[in-house]
Amino acid sequence: MRLSEYASTRKTRGSYKMPRSVQQSIPIDRIYADGVWQSENVFSLMWQISDINYAMQSDAAKQNILTQLGTVYAGIPADCWMQVCIVSQRMDEKAFARDVLYHRENDGFDALRAERNRQIKANARENGNVVQHKYIIVSTNKPGVKEARERFVQVQGHLLSAFSALECAVTPLDNRARLEVLHKFFRISEEGRFNFDFDNCAKLGQDFRDSIAPDCIRFCKKHIEIEDFYAKCMTISEYPQQLDDKFISALLQQVPYIVLSIDIEPVETEDAFKEIDNAQMKTDAEKVRFNKKSVENLDFTSSVPQRTQEQDRIIANIRKEMTENDQQMFLSLLTVTYFADTLEDLALETDALKTTAANYNCRFTELYFQQERAFNTAMPYGLRRIESVRTMLTKSLTALVPFNTQEILTPGGICYGRNAVTGNLIIGLRTSLVNGNAMVVATSGGGKSMFVKLEILMLYLRFTKARFYVVDPENEYAPLVQELGGEVVNISVDSATHFNPLDFKYDKATKIPPHVAKAEFVLSLCEQIMGKEHILAGDKSLIDDALENIYKPLMASHYTAPCPTIKDLWMALNNQRDKRSKEIALALRIFATGSMQAFAQPTNVDMSNRLICFNIQSLGEQLKPVAMLSMLEYINTAVMSNERNDPKAATWVYFDEIYLLLRDSLSANFLYTSWKRFRKYNAYATGITQNVQDCLTNDTAYAMLANSEFVVMLRQTKDIDSVVELYGLSEPQRKYLLLAQPGEGIIKMGNSLIPFNNPQPKDTKTYKLLTTKPGEME
């Protein structure tokens, strides 16, 4: 088959009838329950693919990605063609207000919410906050839907395999998802009103196109009118010999509402070589004619025209690439459809796209009187109705890179700043991850305290039922905690604030009695005081008996009586007749009635407050092991009694300078257990450290780092190589961390690695609450 037959739209155009209604202008005749669409003799199926970090990769890594992308295209069956469709549009204003901005709660903190909203809106206005989705549509001319489905099963297997090598997720789309993509462009001002149910549609005999069709659509000479909006289609008609891989991302940045489609049709190898041979024969014939004419004119000095020589060189190069480098021939077509509110805006967007294309030595052609055909080619139908295709080899085709960088936009999440590559907002929510525990790592002055305090503030303002516990070794969090009405618990020998580690809240779900719940803590406490080597086998039974005795009044009162204290435990052990009990009591006495009785007092601070900060800056070395253990026990009790079924009522625990806790085996064990168990109790732990190397050499810390799905890497210097190795960062990402200013870095959220920046205006109340710089704090 000749290339002219491949280029023909007879097999790729689908249903081609004169529309008598707006619905009929949508060229889909039938949709099947499994998501297969039919347009006359064309069947299509659609998948969504995730973006990957291409822009921040090294040159070698980029080349590997392009090679693998070539594998994707090479796997297209000969009886199919592919459409790579990138849909780029601004977030809907209503969805933005609903899912990103803070809402009034009338709790005294609405002024802070309003200030955060102003900052988020300013960032969104500056960068547009464009949302991109990428799709693959594969079409075929099989004689029936059964044969088409069989082919799509094979294609899907290939796509899953090939894209998995790129760490790119592939998700098949059902009818509702496919129609919703179209709805966003046919009804631009009604993005949140899409409603479609396949079963009801089939049962009631309704036209599925009614759910997406606009009220009116008009195809003009060089633009399209869709209700009160305007659209225009263009196609690339000229390419350079070597295309820059930034071309696609550059085009998408010019227009806020755009559909960019790349139609790809494989040419069978036999047909490709026939075309090469025919082209070579024409070139050879041209050279013969020229030489013959030169002889006739007695001109023996002239050489073959440069154009013919160039054509000869191109043909030879194509033959070499296909025979020696396994390159495949494709027919490709790049089409864009973009939208605007006015014709003036549409003209400005046209100029912007043409200028950008010219900067990359490409040329856009305005398709006069072909807007309808171009529109139906660009939209994700899997149809091609434009014949001006371009012959490309695999290497050239993969330069049309659909990837740029990963984005995070989780509805109801909090704003972590802006993507350093695209400028889009990073809206994430740790509760959406499989394991939402986090680590924040940075050198001193890298901005880790400000990042963490800002996250606490944003979560506190967003989720009014959430609870927060902060372990603060440097007394940095008190201003923020006090501003939010939280409790600062100062832990030291002479502190006036006390909390009782034997406090207990009965959990109806587990029904664990208090003496059982506290047995492990008290045994660990005795190990800290007496030394683990001095604990005997029977000590646990003695401690268990004493705990059961002191908790009897609490249980008898149905958990309304005051909880016992360590002093009560000391008395219970001392009153037992067993000599060993009295030895344990003697070891406990200094913490029960002696000079270190800080944890033997009833709780005298409001531990029901949903924001509690444990200030351990003044903690002495002798009291530190017991204090740490008591504090962690209190946090553990709070987590265990948490509301488990409501993500908005999660418990958030922050450990600043976590390496201090990792030095003690019992504290380290608590952290290790927390990183594994907290998720079950609707709780999320966060570790903050500047000593990455210490964490990497500690098995417990290494496991925590490796198993945290949310990691914030701010500026790194001496530990940069360790961080790069642990998270597999590219050379550009490494340089970004080395040169990062305070508040800049890389966020790892699940499988996404996103460079970010999060500047905070200094003239805001939020900044004054977060900063630790002298002279800037309130």
Predicted features by range, described:
Residues 440:
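Hydrophobic anchor at the beta1->P-loop junction of P-loop NTPases
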Residues 2-403:
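Extended, folded cores of ATP/NTP-driven motor/assembly subunits in large transport
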Residues 451:
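Hydrophobic positions on the alpha1 helix immediately C-terminal to the Walker A/P-loop
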Residues 730-778:
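Conserved P-loop NTPase
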Residues 52, 59-78, 89, 250-252, ...:
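P-loop NTPase motor domains
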Residues 448:
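Conserved lysine of the Walker
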Residues 458-469, 638:
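Post-Walker A helix-loop "phosphate-sensing" segment adjacent to the P-loop in P-loop NTPases
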Residues 485-489, 700-713:
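A short helix-turn-beta junction within AAA+ P-loop NTPase domains corresponding to the substrate/partner-engaging
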